[in-house]
Amino acid sequence: MTPSSFGHLTPETLALFADRYELTMLQGYLAREHTPEAAFSLYFRDLPRNRGYVVAAGLEQVLAALDSLTFGERALTYLAEEGFDDDFLDSLADFSFSGDVRAVPEGTVAFPNEPLVEVRAPLPEAQLLETLFLNQVGFQSLVATKAARMRDVVEREGDGQTLVDFGSRRAHGTDAGLKAARAAYVGGFDGTSLLAAGEAFGVPTYGTMAHSWVQSFPTERESFRAFVDTYGDESTLLIDTYDTVAGAELAGEVAREAGVDLRGVRLDSGDLATLSKEVHERLPDADVFVSSGMDEYTIREFLRSDGVADGFGPGTALTTSRDAPSLDPVYKLVAVEREGEGGLQPSMKLSSGKVTYPGEKRVGRVEADGAYVHDVLGKRDEAGPGRDLLEPVVRAGERVSASPTLDEIRETTRRNVRSLPPAVRDIEEPGTYEVRVSDGLAAETERLRTRLERREE
């Protein structure tokens, strides 16, 4: 019997997280000795629904992948079974990334057509990274943005309530749940319910109890007493299994009988704003934690209804970014070395609706009095206003410096979002943040467009 496979990626198979056409092209490039230096840009064309900005995330996983991106024996055996040539597989056995990477720091707010990552390397090496880079940066940026919007709501309309990711069980797979927990922390959450994210990334973990705990005992009182006897002052009780208000009163009675100061109670159903006020009246010294269907919209509605909460536990809406489930990032060739022309030459697509800006870029962010005013998208070698957001992170295959801590990244997000114009932060009808195209890049784009159109005539 063939053993079942859970579907884990390992360092030995990580390089196979690539669409087949990447390997098809690699084999062709090497067979034709077509290995010029090339540059690729990873960016998104449009903001997702109701988004005024995107929080860049996932760079650390990109860099971790580059650290160990090799074709192990298991990967090579599989590719041989798939019909790839022996000479090609021999070359893959010695694969390692030797190029350069520039990127915007995680936690930076970004806008359409601005590179989040730029890669310069021999064409086969840069090409191989497409699927993996898009997967890691696109998904985490989507979730970090969703989380940042929730954090912004509780900062602007609440009291800075605690936010905990409860969404791993509803995520689209184990890797999605794990990376969503990290991205939520990057976006400003305080922790996650997922232990694996605590172990892998150091994200603080939180947990209370499930309805099954309460239901497993003969009575609600016995379930509360058993929990309180086990966890004492650390106890947070789920009080809505049968009747929320009665559950709150019972929780108070059990705590007093046991001589315990309850840490808090959790509400997971019903008219949460109304019930939270009734619970707070009965348990004024206990934290009230609210879950069930939470996102930036329901949290804002809860707060505007004068609900009482010390924390929220968003789940499905967070880990799936339910209202805007796709960022659709792209990874496009923007420059390539051409024989006889000297150095990298800018390249672009002319497809309808998918025109790209050619060449490597700089993204200048112009600020005034600590607030972001506008960005300028320009050529990499072009002088321009504002600080360039793209920083070297890998040079000749080696990391340039140590990565920031997760807490430092989280602070970068907080600082970036607060620096945006208030209208851009609106969660339903955000204003447009201005991104200007430099004169040099505009001229380069028009020059290359004209040349390509003439070539096709």
Where do the protein language model's features map onto the residues?
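Ordered alpha/beta subdomains of enzyme catalytic regions
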Residues: M1-Y231, L333-E457
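Glycine-rich phosphate/ribose-binding loops and adjacent secondary-structure elements
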Residues: S212-G370
